[in-house]
Amino acid sequence: MEFKLKHKDGMARVCEITTAHSTFLTPVFMPVGTVGAVKSLDANDMKNELDAKIILANTYHMYLRPTSKVVKDFGGLHGFTKFDRSFLTDSGGFQAFSLSKNSKHFNEGIEFKSHIDGSRHLFTPKSVLDTQYDFNSDIMMILDDLVALPATKERVKISVDRTILWAKEAITYHKSMQNKGIGIGQNIFGIIQGGTDYKERKRCALSLNEMPFDGLAIGGLSVGEENALMYETVQNLNPYLDENRPRYLMGVGTPEDLVENVERGVDMFDCVMPTRNARNGTFFTSFGKFNIKKAEFINDHEAIDPACSCYTCCNFSRGYLNHLFKAKELTFFRLASLHNLHYYLELARKMREAILNNSFTQFKRNFYHLRGK
């Protein structure tokens, strides 16, 4: 992976990242294709309608079904999905933690029950990389020990100890596999844990900074803490993160979260929020969000956002989308998802532009002003 820090405005950054399959600028939002597809959209939508340069797929889900062997037989995720740009795959640790009621965390890994058939599985630092080698993803995430917040100091310390242990095991294994010709062209990111405990976050960040990861992620946030505490945690981490590697805030979040964390030096984001909200009838716009199912939109001839240039806004009215949603027409999910993802990707583009123009502070002021804040 090639990484270039192109410009800074305060702590906000524009970086250029080149993988084996695409080049993209940050700040970047990565649409989430949990099972190898962004819900209701295909590779053509992602490339031609949205021009997404990188998307995320989920190791836990793809490991269980269709299995990594099947994906490998198709030539990895790119051959399987026909999305020929960059893929980031997470380690599956979060899903093993959140979807399995009886998951157990040991120093060896995470034992969990499949949410599909109840079968038992073990994720280890090595096994999740083996799965991602089969996927041939451009960016692989290591296994980390996530804790739900609030958590005791003792549990947070165990999480950091275990995450550092697994990080060492993962990076050593990855380098040894590359020496054998496996994982060439694949990049590996470490994940910083520590909850909202300043000392533990710092300890984890400093330890992972010493390891030759291609990038660093901030995990374990947006899991129950207040937004202000999340922002403070990210800001406090900034001095301890290597400037010459990408910074990825996992699973975050709202448009406001993106703006606030870009201001605090984050480069990469992913979240299911735009597509999940789309399926529930909620649209993100330059003036905030609203739900299309309200009766006031039945005869509304306006686009979802008159300032938006997405396929949905250029072709269809709020009244039509109100009708599709109430009729439970499947077409609605595609049109709504196209709009919401376009909004997120366009927000990232506007932030890049503002940073390059040294006007991010003014951009943020205008962003909130349009929302009446």
UniProtKB/Swiss-Prot annotation:
Binds 1 zinc ion per subunit. Its EC number is 2.4.2.29. Zn(2+) binds at C308, C310, C313, H339. Pathway: tRNA modification; tRNA-queuosine biosynthesis. Substrate binds at D90, S91, G92, G93, F94, D144, Q193, G220. GO terms for cellular component: cytosol. Keywords: Glycosyltransferase, Metal-binding, Queuosine biosynthesis, Transferase, tRNA processing, Zinc. InterPro entries: TGT, TGT-like_sf, tRNA_ribo_trans-like. Its cofactor is Zn(2+). GO terms for biological process: queuosine biosynthetic process; tRNA-guanine transglycosylation. GO terms for molecular function: metal ion binding; tRNA-guanosine(34) queuine transglycosylase activity. It catalyses: 7-aminomethyl-7-carbaguanine + guanosine(34) in tRNA = 7-aminomethyl-7-carbaguanosine(34) in tRNA + guanine. Coiled coil: none annotated. The active site is at D90 (proton acceptor), D270 (nucleophile). Residues 251-257, 275-279 are annotated as: RNA binding. Gene3D superfamilies: Queuine tRNA-ribosyltransferase-like (3.20.20.105). Homodimer. Within each dimer, one monomer is responsible for RNA recognition and catalysis, while the other monomer binds to the replacement base PreQ1. Catalyzes the base-exchange of a guanine (G) residue with the queuine precursor 7-aminomethyl-7-deazaguanine (PreQ1) at position 34 (anticodon wobble position) in tRNAs with GU(N) anticodons (tRNA-Asp, -Asn, -His and -Tyr). Catalysis occurs through a double-displacement mechanism. The nucleophile active site attacks the C1' of nucleotide 34 to detach the guanine base from the RNA, forming a covalent enzyme-RNA intermediate. The proton acceptor active site deprotonates the incoming PreQ1, allowing a nucleophilic attack on the C1' of the ribose to form the product. NCBIfam families: Q_tRNA_tgt (TIGR00430), tgt_general (TIGR00449). Belongs to the queuine tRNA-ribosyltransferase family. This is Queuine tRNA-ribosyltransferase. It comes from Campylobacter jejuni subsp. jejuni serotype O:6 (strain 81116 / NCTC 11828). The lineage of its organism: Bacteria, Pseudomonadati, Campylobacterota, Epsilonproteobacteria, Campylobacterales.
